[in-house]
C-alpha cells in the first residue's frame, strides 16, 4: 500500500486529478488553477530548499536496508511528496465542500509512505508537510486579500 501511495504522490498526479474532478463537478476552474499553483509553488520550494540544505537520503547515508523504491538522486530535505501533498490538500479543503479530514489523512499517508519505503527520514516528511501548509496558507492570503481589496474606486 505504501509503495503505491509513494508512486501516486509522484508529480502530484493524485492531487491534480482530484482537483480536475472537483473543478468539473463544481464547475469552478479556480479549483484546478489554484491547486496547480499550490503544487507548482510547493515543488519549486522543495527543490530550492533541497539544494540549500543538501541532506543525504537514508540509502546514501546508510545503504542497509535496501529501499523499497528506486532512490531519487536529489537531496532529501524536505520531502517533495509531503510538500506538494499538504499544499494541495489545504487548497482543496479551502476551495471545495470536500471534508478536510480525508484530504489530510491521504496527504499524511503519502508523506509517511516516503519514510516507509526508505527514501526519507521522518524529519524530511514533517518538514515537507509544514512547508506545504505554509505555501497553501500564503496562496490563500494572496488570493483572498486580492479579492477583498478589488479594484480601486473611481476618483471622485
Task: Kindly label every feature range from the protein language model.
Residues 1-15, 46-74, 151-156:
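N-terminal transmembrane-helix/juxtamembrane module of multi-pass inner/ER membrane proteins
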Residues 3, 23, 27, 31, ...:
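Membrane-helix interfacial "entry" motifs
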Residues 8-12, 32-36, 99-105:
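Alpha-helical transmembrane segments
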Residues 10, 25-26, 53-54, 97, ...:
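Short helix-capping/hinge motifs at transmembrane helix termini and TM-loop junctions
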Residues 17-45:
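Interfacial segments of alpha-helical transmembrane regions
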Residues 18, 63-156:
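Membrane-embedded catalytic cores of phosphoryl/pyrophosphoryl-handling enzymes
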Residues 22, 46-50, 54, 93, ...:
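Membrane-water interface at transmembrane helix exits
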Residues 36-52, 101-113:
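Small-polar-interrupted transmembrane alpha-helices in polytopic inner-membrane proteins
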Amino acid at each position: 500500500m505504501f509503495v503505491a501511495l509513494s508512486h501516486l504522490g509522484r508529480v502530484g498526479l493524485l492531487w491534480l486529478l482530484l482537483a480536475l474532478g472537483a473543478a468539473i463537478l463544481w464547475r469552478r476552474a479556480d479549483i484546478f488553477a489554484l491547486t496547480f499553483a499550490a503544487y507548482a509553488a510547493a515543488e519549486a520550494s522543495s527543490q530550492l530548499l533541497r539544494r540549500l540544505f543538501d541532506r543525504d537520503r537514508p540509502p546514501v547515508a546508510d545503504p542497509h536496508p535496501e529501499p523499497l523504491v528506486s532512490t531519487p538522486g536529489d537531496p532529501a530535505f524536505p520531502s517533495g511528496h509531503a510538500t506538494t501533498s499538504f499544499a494541495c490538500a489545504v487548497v482543496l479543503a479551502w476551495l471545495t465542500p470536500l471534508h478536510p479530514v480525508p484530504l489530510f489523512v491521504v496527504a499524511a499517508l503519502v508523506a509517511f509512505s516516503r519514510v516507509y519505503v526508505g527514501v526519507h527520514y521522518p524529519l524530511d516528511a514533517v518538514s515537507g508537510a509544514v512547508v506545504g501548509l505554509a505555501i497553501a496558507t500564503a496562496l490563500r492570503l494572496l488570493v483572498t486579500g486580492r479579492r477583498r481589496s478589488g479594484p480601486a474606486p473611481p476618483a471622485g
